[in-house]
Regions:
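A common structural junction motif
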Residues: 76-82
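Catalytic-core segments of nucleotide cyclases and related cyclic-nucleotide turnover enzymes
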Residues: 96-105
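Charged, alpha-helix-enriched surfaces in structured cytosolic catalytic cores
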Residues: 65, 83, 102-103
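Catalytic NTP-binding/metal-coordinating core of nucleotidyl cyclase/transferase enzymes
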Residues: 1-69, 76
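A short glycine-enriched loop-to-beta-strand structural element that forms part of the catalytic core
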Residues: 82-96
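A residue-level structural signature of the nucleotidyltransferase/glycosyltransferase Rossmann-like core
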Residues: 7, 85, 99-100
Length: 105
């Protein structure tokens, strides 16, 4: 299928009610969140392949990069009102058109 890869997925917890309550505030929080995640991805050697809604899909060549990225995001958002869920998955996947596919995903 493809080489073994590591994937990090993120999602902001409770974002829909926040959008309903205050769109301007949520837009600012989301922009901050996106900067934090993208900075952590760059530092950890990952590749963003998905940004649906308020979450990210990021590919890494090894689990060390994915864990480092997740910890970097957590550390940067410690004082932030947003709670971000993150999951890491490892398995075979193939890359096509700047995205990944296969049973792992």
């Amino acid at each position: 299928m493809g080489p073994l890869r590591c994937f990090l997925f993120t999602d902001i917890e409770g974002s829909s009610p926040r959008w309903d309550a205050d769109q301007d505030e949520m837009a600012g929080l989301l922009a901050h969140h996106d900067r934090v995640v993208r900075d952590a991805v760059v530092r950890s050697g990952g590749k963003v392949f998905s940004t649906g809604g308020d979450g990210f899909g990021v590919a890494f060549d090894d689990v060390t990069g994915a864990i480092g990225c997740a910890l970097g995001v957590q550390d940067a958002l410690t004082q932030d009102p947003l709670r971000v869920r993150m999951g890491i998955h490892v398995g075979e996947a193939s890359e096509r058109d700047n995205s990944f596919f296969g049973p792992t995903l």
